[in-house]
Amino acid sequence: MSLKSVLFFASLALGHVIQPRSFSCQSPQLTQEQIDIAEEMSIKEKSMRKSGMTIQATISVDVWLHAISASESGLSSDSALQNQFDTLQKTFSPYNINLNYAGKTKTVNAQWANEGNGQEMPMKKALRRGNYQSMNVYIVDVLPTASGYCYYPTNAPEGSDNFYIDGCTLAKSAMGLIAAHEAGHWLGLAHTFDGNNCDGPGDYVDDTPAQSGPSSGCPASRDSCPNHPGTDPIHNYMDYTSPDCWTEFTPGQIDRVNSQWNRYRA
């Protein structure tokens, strides 16, 4: 998105991820159609909760990791890829979102390794695996303006551009919990501060407190909307706080993930 944080580049050592303390996300803004659908989902979810019903069920996701680099030596190691999957799995398993490591690919291609070269679609058409329920994560050398991004779920018949463009892209230096933030978008979640307006709908999820804009670092008790209930959700994976500050999705966010999954990916 247009909102940017400072990216402190990390490195990989012995296959272990060293996590940047802040980042920038380039996931696209919600379209008007996606906003309208989010509003519809919010109404339905609220009605179900009032009736004592739950929309939540077990979701199973095959995960494909694709390492792309300009050189053989620049490719992410098998252990780094395994660590990345393990981080995703650990993040989502408490919410009945079960991830399966379906496989990996490794590709040396200087054009694809730099996202600034405009080769996203050719790369994804060549590398994508699985169906629309499969999360494909592309790990590249360079993302010129961001740490990562994912596409929101949408109508995507197999073989269509929407089908191929789907997935998540990460700079290799941003591997780790940042992938969990981006995967939240792939599952249908917006930023908690979406709209940057205390009085707006925000992320269209009822139980994430109002937030005037993105947080950074890990600012205890930050309250950017003091006239609204709750303090800013600094521990939420969908804020811009430091990844080591993240610990949670809300029940309402998991309702939304299920609504999005049932509509687009089930």
Residue ranges and their predicted role:
Residues H16-M135, I139-L143, N262-R265:
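Propeptide-to-catalytic entry region of secreted or membrane-anchored zinc metalloproteases
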Residues S24-P28, Y149-Y151, G167-T169, D199, ...:
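Sequence contexts marking disulfide-bonded cysteines in secreted/extracellular proteins
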Residues N83-S216:
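Metzincin-family zinc-dependent endopeptidase catalytic domain
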Residues L65-S69, A174, T241-S242:
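Short, histidine-centered active-site or binding-site loop motifs used for metal coordination
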Residues L75-N83, A174, I178, D232, ...:
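Soluble non-cytosolic domains of exported or imported proteins
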Residues M1-P20:
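Fungal secretory targeting signals
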Residues A57-I59, N131, N162-Y164, D232-I234:
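A short, polar/charged loop/turn motif at coil->beta-strand junctions and beta-hairpin connectors
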Residues E158-S160, V205-A266:
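Metalloprotease/metallohydrolase-associated module, dominated by Zn2+-dependent proteases
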